Amino acid sequence: VHLTPEEKNAVTTLWGKVNVDEVGGEALGRLLLVYPWTQRFFESFGDLSSPDAVMGNPKVKAHGKKVLGAFSDGLNHLDNLKGTFAQLSELHCDKLHVDPENFKLLGNVLVCVLAHHFGKEFTPQVQAAYQKVVAGVANALAHKYH
């Protein structure tokens, strides 16, 4: 992902304020609610029958935290996202058979959650930088599918 120095600074500055536990669970929960067909990949998570069940599900929260942990790692390797996400790409492609379009959906949901949490601090410029990053991460995760 090519970011200007200003974009990189905007992304890393805001990310330093992100509560990965909270935002990860919320982003994954929203993905499962807004795009309910994604729930089929999480059948082992138990009750996903209602918005309250999804958003309160400890397995959703734990996996969301794990997802954002990997995303954080990616932010430290923006110049090598394909290498950083190679193993996760292989896992999601070969073993889990996740449609790579879902990575784009989750990235867009994450941007919405960040906007919700940071309000005016999440300026259009910050959003543009994050859109570049989530697109790059989605592309890296989809790499093994090609």
Curated annotation (Swiss-Prot):
The modification N-acetylvaline is found at V1. The modification Phosphothreonine is found at T12. Heme b binds at H63, H92. Red blood cells. The keyword Transcription does not apply. GO terms for molecular function: heme binding; hemoglobin alpha binding; metal ion binding; oxygen binding; oxygen carrier activity. It comes from the Eukaryota. The modification Phosphoserine is found at S44. GO terms for biological process: cellular oxidant detoxification; hydrogen peroxide catabolic process. Keywords: Acetylation, Heme, Iron, Metal-binding, Oxygen transport, Phosphoprotein, S-nitrosylation, Transport. SUPFAM superfamilies: Globin-like. GO terms for cellular component: haptoglobin-hemoglobin complex; hemoglobin complex. The modification N6-acetyllysine is found at K59, K82, K144. Residues 2-146 form the Globin domain. The modification S-nitrosocysteine is found at C93. Heterotetramer of two alpha chains and two beta chains. Involved in oxygen transport from the lung to the various peripheral tissues. Belongs to the globin family. This is Hemoglobin subunit beta. The lineage of its organism: Eukaryota, Metazoa, Chordata, Craniata, Vertebrata. The gene is HBB.
